Amino acid sequence: MNFEDKVKQLFDEHEVLLSRRNEPQEKENGIITRYKHPILTAAHTPVFWRYDLDEKTNPYLMERIGMNATLNSGAIKWNGKYVLVVRVEGADRKSFFAVAESPNGIDNFRFWDYPVTMPEDVIPATNIYDMRLTAHEDGWIYGIFCAERHDPSAPAGDLSSATATAAIARTKDLKNWERLPDPVSYTHLRAHET
């Protein structure tokens, strides 16, 4: 099989996955309807995110950017579609946000062509994840999420220690985001006050 045929096969297999109809499971408890297939997996991420599709730079068509998982999405019904801001976790266990949409919220979720470009706060984050969305009457969609940063009190050379804080951003189109200052809460300090 030549390179072009392999690329076509990747896209064809991807389209089968994306367009697969999701059916309810036979057993149900009368309260929750569970479906046979997850609505999003790492395999749903666009082929062109994962592969360099240029035969000159990737002659063996090896996956270049591994995706580990899609999880913990914020959801909203927006412009008549079910839209998720998905935590996409790379093989390096670092996460980024990407938008996927579906006409019915059950199947046919498709990622937008580009992941979310989230502006940094004053102190850059090493990882961001688990956004929740709220459409506000002021016309903005607000996203609250977790931002991890290197722990400044960690011993020298310890790159695994991190602090986690709430972070907030807003958008009107889910493409262009404005980062707002991280919320500050002093209530978590009460247990330590003397």
At which residue positions do the language-model features occur?
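Residue-level detector of Asp-centered blade-edge/turn motifs that repeat once per structural unit
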Residues: 77-79, 135-138
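N-terminal regions that are enriched for targeting/export leaders
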Residues: 1-64, 68-73
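Blade-edge beta-strand/turn elements of extracellular beta-propeller
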Residues: 107-119, 174-186
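Beta-propeller and closely related beta-sheet repeat lectin domains
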Residues: 71-74, 127-132, 193
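Entry beta-strands of beta-propeller and related beta-repeat scaffolds
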Residues: 81-83, 139-143
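Conserved small/polar residues in nucleotide/adenosyl-binding loops
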Residues: 187-194
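Beta-propeller blade signature
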Residues: 98-105, 164-173
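Short glycine/acidic-enriched loop and turn motifs that connect beta-strands
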Residues: 89-93, 148-152
